[in-house]
């Protein structure tokens, strides 16, 4: 990836430009789709609420996600040990999670649409496009970081602290 540059133009306004390698473009698009799929699955499995259907307000899950990546993308609204009124965390999550997922999906969709299946490796964003782009990239980073942490935990459980040696050992087992 080339470093980002800022270009000012009278006709096009301010633009932020970079050039991705083809593999980077493909991996970024695939990652955006993977995170979107997980978020959509979470939204689809939300319990149906009769009051929400009557009022038109979407209702989400009351419990935090079990998937570590989703748990980081959709964290609790209260910290462990903070004083809270019974049910506040669940109610807050239930009322806000769907909107948070919707915003994250729109940002990820922007990246996917921009890159497209045969999209350009040249990225040129307006000032208005920078925020959704960076939000989506950050969500992808957070999700994959949580997955990597789980992978490292699995390695420690199985006794291999070095991923390279673990992979090498697993290759010889088969």
Predicted regions located by residue number:
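Short, extreme N-terminal leader segments that mark the start of a protein/domain
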Residues: 1-49
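Non-transmembrane, amphipathic alpha-helical segments
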Residues: 12-27, 31, 62, 92-103, ...
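A structural signal for well-ordered alpha-helices, especially hydrophobic packing surfaces
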Residues: 36, 108, 112-115, 119, ...
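Gly-Asp-aromatic-enriched flexible segments
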Residues: 39-78, 82
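Short, glycine/acidic-rich hinge or "gate" loops at secondary-structure transitions
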Residues: 45, 151-157
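Hydrophobic/aromatic-rich, well-ordered segments within soluble, folded domains that form packed cores
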Residues: 124-150
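Conserved small/polar residues in nucleotide/adenosyl-binding loops
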Residues: 167-174
């Amino acid at each position: 990836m080339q470093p980002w540059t800022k270009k000012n133009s009278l006709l096009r306004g301010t633009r932020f430009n970079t050039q991705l390698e083809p593999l980077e473009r493909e991996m970024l698009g695939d990652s955006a789709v993977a995170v979107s799929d997980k978020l959509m699955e979470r939204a689809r499995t939300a319990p149906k609420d009769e009051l929400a259907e009557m009022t038109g307000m979407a209702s989400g899950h009351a419990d935090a996600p079990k998937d570590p990546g989703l748990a980081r993308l959709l964290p609790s609204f209260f910290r462990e040990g903070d004083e809270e009124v019974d049910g506040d965390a669940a109610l807050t999550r239930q009322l806000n999670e769907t909107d948070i997922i919707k915003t994250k999906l729109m940002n990820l969709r922007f990246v996917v649409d921009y890159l497209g299946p045969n999209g350009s490796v040249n990225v040129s964003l307006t000032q208005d496009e920078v925020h959704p782009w960076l939000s989506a990239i950050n969500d992808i980073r957070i999700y994959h970081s949580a997955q990597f942490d789980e992978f490292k935990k699995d390695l420690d459980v199985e006794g291999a602290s070095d991923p390279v040696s673990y992979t090498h050992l697993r290759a010889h087992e088969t």
